[in-house]
Amino acid sequence: MFQVQKELASHEAVIVALFEEEETSSFVQELDKAFEGQLQVLLEEKELSTKKKAISKVHSLGKTEVKRYYFVGLGKKESYTTETLRSALGKTFKTLQAAKVQDAAILLDSFVTEKLDAIDVAHIAAEVQGLGTYELQTYKSDKKDRVELEKFTAITAEDAQEIEAALTVGYVHGRATNSARTLVNMPPNVLTATKLAEYAVELAEKYDMDYKVLEKEEMEELGMGALLAVNQGSVEPPKMIALIYKGKEEWTDVIGFVGKGITYDTGGYSLKPREGMVGMKGDMGGAAAVLGAMEIIGELRPEQNVIAVIPSTDNVVSGTAFKPDDVITSMSGKTIEVLNTDAEGRLALADGITYAKKLGANYLIDVATLTGGVIVALGNHTTGAMTNNEELFEQVLEASMETDESIWQLPIFDRDKERVRNSKFADLNNSPGREGHAVMAGTFLGEFAEDTPWVHLDIAGTSESSGAHDLGPAGATGAMVRTLATLVERFGEE
């Protein structure tokens, strides 16, 4: 699909950057020769817009071998960022998709500044081409034909091999994010814990990873009472899924991802209202993020050891379901007083974290659609983070900045630990109250990470979008897939 060339050839469409600046760029000046000065006229008349994310289409009318040009406004160079580029190109690729373009090129060097080099631009362009044109996988009987971009050429004076490598990495990041999106969008009667486990096994076998899928009996033997409690009301069997990627000869410095895999959450006996229940098929967004990251890792083969653990079940009401006031025993041996059955994700993750440690994880990152409280605190564009290790958190933060997936650190104080440890009947309680809800959930998980360096990522606000945006349609976003993979790719770098 991807090609790298030094000069333009015949294409259906070519993408060119336009910045707000006094002098027209050399790229536009060169094109303007073929247009006999008409591009400059269009700029002066403001029919070619340089404003951020503005897209101006110009037909060549036979003056060049290119059928039409798409000029992408990027605003002022001093305010140009990777986020600006991602949004602008996402919108551009949506436009090309709507026009059914199958052969496109990008004047890569026209997007290069002191802040962004050609490798950055190539990576982002390939990544965003997949993200921006993603479509929901629906179950409608009347399916529309989809025209795909079949050929994408980067025009650049830079080293072709380096640009090709960046295009490949970007493409893999975008495709895996879309894989996670598709999982989150699947209905809960289709994506059960069993189906999620089957998907994970197929992924592991495709990329020659080791894997384990624990059944209920094995969980009972290991004492996974927290996950099993959540599963008590369900006819669907629970699964504890583990994928093991060995990127080094020695099994050291192992990064452990733990993704919440609640395939549907009714709230249990702490029942959600109807409006709060619809959409809870997405409560396995953390599991999807982890599997998306493992897809990238499998494709790119970084020299790093990684474990992915997914505790999976649904949380439903029945005569056998767990109840408020129950006391359960987790795999760690710590007992938990259940005050809220709708705080089930942290129970499943507690056993997932302990299991990841048992498998050898030296670092832990859990990802979960965990609390509505994080949405109240941070909105729908920022993931909440908590940690017991600032050095590990800084690496996660740097990865998130590289991928433009915003995260913000929330605190854990001793008084927060006291609240989750406040129980007359058990070591911990799973829901101390509404105040500081997001912080309480993360603090609870920290009790199971213990001294292992750990970062908690609450993606309840960022896992799904209520409306279409530059990088995709309404629905699942694939939040944190690219950040997790980038963390592994960059882990330990100075």
Swiss-Prot record:
> Where along this sequence does the record place binding of Mn(2+) 1?
D265, D342, E344
Q: What cofactor does its activity depend on?
A: Mn(2+)
Give any Pfam family that matches: Peptidase_M17
Supply the enzyme class, top level: hydrolase
Full protein name: Probable cytosol aminopeptidase
The reaction(s) annotated as catalysed by this protein in its Swiss-Prot or TrEMBL entry are:
Release of an N-terminal amino acid, Xaa-|-Yaa-, in which Xaa is preferably Leu, but may be other amino acids including Pro although not Arg or Lys, and Yaa may be Pro. Amino acid amides and methyl esters are also readily hydrolyzed, but rates on arylamides are exceedingly low; Release of an N-terminal amino acid, preferentially leucine, but not glutamic or aspartic acids
- Main localization of the protein? cytoplasm
PROSITE patterns on file: CYTOSOL_AP
State its role.
Presumably involved in the processing and regular turnover of intracellular proteins. Catalyzes the removal of unsubstituted N-terminal amino acids from various peptides.
List the CDD domains hit by this protein, alphabetically.
Answer: Peptidase_M17
* Gene Ontology CC annotations of this record: cytoplasm
Q: What is the active site of this protein?
A: K272, R346
Q: Which GO terms describe its molecular function?
A: manganese ion binding; metalloaminopeptidase activity
Enzyme Commission (EC) number = 3.4.11.1, 3.4.11.10
Instruction: Could you list this entry's UniProt keywords, alphabetically sorted.
Output: Aminopeptidase, Cytoplasm, Hydrolase, Manganese, Metal-binding, Protease
Q: Which HAMAP family match?
A: Cytosol_peptidase_M17
Similarity remark: Belongs to the peptidase M17 family.
Can you tell me where the transmembrane regions are? none
Q: What's a GO biological-process term for it? A: proteolysis
Q: How is the cofactor bound?
A: Binds 2 manganese ions per subunit.
